[in-house]
């Protein structure tokens, strides 16, 4: 069973010479915009192996010289693959850590020693407890100290690092704002170990470990920028497209305290190690024509022309030979013969992505349409990771599919219960208790007992506590009720609304259980029963909580099993990926774009508003202060505006899709 097929999705095939150049000259040419040596790998595993190789070499060299290897490390999730690779080598007898000294880069403050979320406890759990490092060789800032003793402790911590000869290497991840260790934007180049306040953005990232933002300690004791730069070698790692923007600022931007990681540009042996998704915004990956000759695919040509339109402020059909020549795209003139020919080609390609018939237009020529005309009507399943992702991400298309006569099913993959606030439970419990008093003559003792039990639990609940099973069930029921209301509003029969309640989600915590066979079998059973002609799945693979990726992996695994079983229905099924909750598709990747009128956009907003528990009081709105309906409308309007600026038809809004080839 293949449980990670989403990681195999490659929208843009990057030629190897742009991330793994064969010679030093080629590397120098394609990295001309980069100010920190940056190594890009196709997968996280390959990047982790590369760093582990260099660490192993350093550890063994230090042992041969009869000295200890001094290593600074952080505790972010981006370092876990490297730790796993090092553990594997220790278990295979290839590497020993007896002569390695570890300095923890930061610790939360104040936090008691037993708390599992302490940085050092996380490091022990994922790395240190699995190797043969001596306990006396592990040093960490102390988050249990009285505050008035912290400054002196930091001074001693700095002194100890220097006394042992300084760090041979420090291994760090990077935060969304460019923070390294917990040095936030504004940190000085000359800063040393100190107590600092954790800002809101960093707290948002840390809540994945702590369960909620409120339980993240207010401060941390961190190595300073000067301390980090004192290491003889620095590795900075990042994986995934959600880190692409900050990696570009770190590697290609100017040195600024607004991006603390950019200070690595001043170090003589700093290395950024990333995977292809994290490298997506670097010039050699996003705009390769600016650094070398390209193998021009249709997608790359489309990307180049959209970029050219944006920097010239012109629509596609007004681009001239001069525009191409002045902006590094003369190769396209040689390829197409003239700007006119290239313009027409890409204009037509984009025009053909637009359709008002997402299920296919019956009895019409579908040669240039993204979806086939037949069969009609189609059986369709829209998979929604949470009970509101369907309307947030493709509410206009969903409504259009129903109105155009297709047999539409919606499958809500998870209960979404942890995203419901406690006050919603209290409100519904008041209603149930009141209903019992009014119409049941208070005869139902179960309701009375449960009311008291749940009320007592919520009153005594502390920040970070996991909800009881009863509370999670009620929260799930609230989400189900909202999903049914929205589906009814969109004219979807309730017998076409399926609640899958995939088991991986039911951990009661932000961090979910591993997605496995039980999840896939639930999805496969639904798919094989309905045998759809169209499937819609979430393509927001960088969502901050990981639920979308796991849900999509479950669907793709189920489809792969059906393919292996040679299911006949699969030959006439297309799979479309949507986005919208956290990001939008890049225009070069869009294969179907559905226009939305002002009235349809209003209806989409109303269907999102049916999910009342996900408005202002929802626990996990992320860093974006806009409500989900506002984010959705802004993205849909942004897509329409981009098409308009390129010289195509002007619509109120548009929803975009990319096809997944089974």
Regions found by a protein language model. Give the residues of each.
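N-terminal glycine-/serine-/threonine-rich phosphate-binding loop
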Residues: 2-70, 366-367, 374
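ATP/nucleoside-binding phosphotransfer catalytic cores, i.e., glycine-rich phosphate-binding loops
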Residues: 2-12, 25, 226, 230-330
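Ligand-binding beta-strand-loop-alpha-helix segment within the catalytic cores
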Residues: 13, 22-35, 95-169
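Glycine-rich N-terminal segment of FAD-binding domains in flavoprotein oxidoreductases
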Residues: 63-92
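Histidine-anchored nucleotide/phosphate-binding helix
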Residues: 82-93, 390-415, 419
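Short, surface-exposed, charged loop/turn segments at secondary-structure junctions
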Residues: 176-198, 251-254, 549-558, 591-596
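Class I SAM-dependent methyltransferase SAM-binding "motif I" and its flanking Rossmann-like core
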Residues: 181-225
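Metal-dependent de-N-acetylase/amidase catalytic core
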Residues: 203-211, 215-220, 312-381, 400-404, ...
